[in-house]
Amino acid sequence: MLRAFEDAGVDLFHASTRRFGDPEWPESDLGLAGWARKLSGKPVIAVGGVGLTVDMVETFSGKDTNASPDINFPALAKRFNAHEFDLIAIGRSNIADPDWVAKVRDGRPDFIRQFKLADLGDVAEEAKQASTKAS
């Protein structure tokens, strides 16, 4: 499938998963971003749970998010230094606190505002209802 995208002119892949650092298959330590990079040789953006302990599905179930860049930065640094991805995207953490990157850069993680389901507004209620129906 990656080959078809490459043939169509894709020059960057965005590998979005619940948790960027989780291996995609049990036989390998590579996450989805790592596999995309390995198979295509193209630059890859990884995303999924950066600085968070709870994934989006758990958030919709009412589980509180503990936010800190220290939570999974060792895994992020390890995978980045292993050239599994070229860029990292920040989703929920940046929705909750638009200054997240600056606070991490400046060594002020204690000032990061944690993501709450209410940060998504009306979308949160619709997703919560859909999640309840699916259960």
Language-model regions, residue ranges each:
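Flavin-dependent oxidoreductase catalytic cores
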Residues: 1-135
